[in-house]
Amino acid sequence: MSLFNVSNGLRTALRPSVASSSRVAAFSTTAAARLATPTSDNVGSSGKPQHLKQFKIYRWNPDKPSEKPRLQSYTLDLNQTGPMVLDALIKIKNEIDPTLTFRRSCREGICGSCAMNIDGVNTLACLCRIDKQNDTKIYPLPHMYIVKDLVPDLTQFYKQYRSIEPFLKSNNTPSEGEHLQSPEERRRLDGLYECILCACCSTSCPSYWWNQDEYLGPAVLMQAYRWMADSRDDFGEERRQKLENTFSLYRCHTIMNCSRTCPKNLNPGKAIAQIKKDMAVGAPKASERPIMASS
């Protein structure tokens, strides 16, 4: 699987076998060192023996377009680091290399900012625990243009999201008070509204890799279904008609990478399948729609 960035207007592929930078910090150990009695050389400031670990992180600087993307290694003492990968990234940026660039905000799996590929899996760095036994490789979300280091360009992703009109469209909005729905109708939105638009699912989808200019991808399609399934929305038929073309919806081939990688345990593949069914046999009443939330 290749990762892409922008260099002089062209996409440059970085394969996992790419050589590390000559500036990579070397780290090695031996059985004797692991079994040695702690001394001032191998004891951290906490008084515990150091638990050293390497993080190999994708680096690319748009200000130096002639330099190829590379993996740069950083060594941390896990006894001085929080338990999550995002904790390690923040420690590296604060204490070792301030040029390292990545997105982050809430640190609790709500905002979706820190989505990246960690050890081959798209996930949120704030929810991914550090593997204490093996080196960790961190890349940006795959098959996206790269702004810098671990920051993907999500311009096209948000353009597609805007295209589905992600808001209620109703002909019967109450003139006063709330626009109510029954508990059963509300229950049909579980497993849909929790999406945080992190793009982990879309960037894990091979169909989206090759057709992202026209295929909307699992995240956006699940959000499209979220509004179709809402009992307060009166434009479900029009929303489905907008997807009636070769690429927008039907490039989904039920590979299901999207459902496997979702850090919120949602099922975009199931939502996409329901859109296809609605378009084939007609949409059911809101209160009769299948429940998308995992049991």
Swiss-Prot record:
PROSITE patterns: 2FE2S_FER_1 (PS00197), 2FE2S_FER_2 (PS51085), 4FE4S_FER_1 (PS00198), 4FE4S_FER_2 (PS51379). It is a peripheral membrane protein. Keywords: 2Fe-2S, 3Fe-4S, 4Fe-4S, Electron transport, Iron, Iron-sulfur, Membrane, Metal-binding, Mitochondrion, Mitochondrion inner membrane, Oxidoreductase, Transit peptide, Transport, Tricarboxylic acid cycle. [2Fe-2S] cluster binds at residues 106, 111, 114, 126. This is Succinate dehydrogenase [ubiquinone] iron-sulfur subunit, mitochondrial. It comes from the Eukaryota. The lineage of its organism: Eukaryota, Fungi, Dikarya, Basidiomycota, Ustilaginomycotina. Disulfide bonds: none annotated. A ubiquinone binds at residue 210. Residues 185-215 form the 4Fe-4S ferredoxin-type domain. It is an enzyme of class 1 (oxidoreductase). It catalyses: a quinone + succinate = fumarate + a quinol. Residues 67-144 form the 2Fe-2S ferredoxin-type domain. Its EC number is 1.3.5.1. Iron-sulfur protein (IP) subunit of succinate dehydrogenase (SDH) that is involved in complex II of the mitochondrial electron transport chain and is responsible for transferring electrons from succinate to ubiquinone (coenzyme Q). Its cofactor is [2Fe-2S] cluster; [3Fe-4S] cluster; [4Fe-4S] cluster. Component of complex II composed of four subunits: a flavoprotein (FP), an iron-sulfur protein (IP), and a cytochrome b composed of a large and a small subunit. GO terms for biological process: aerobic respiration; mitochondrial electron transport, succinate to ubiquinone; respiratory electron transport chain; tricarboxylic acid cycle. It comes from Mycosarcoma maydis. GO terms for cellular component: mitochondrial inner membrane; mitochondrial membrane; respiratory chain complex II (succinate dehydrogenase). Belongs to the succinate dehydrogenase/fumarate reductase iron-sulfur protein family. Pathway: Carbohydrate metabolism; tricarboxylic acid cycle; fumarate from succinate (eukaryal route): step 1/1. [4Fe-4S] cluster binds at residues 195, 198, 201, 262.
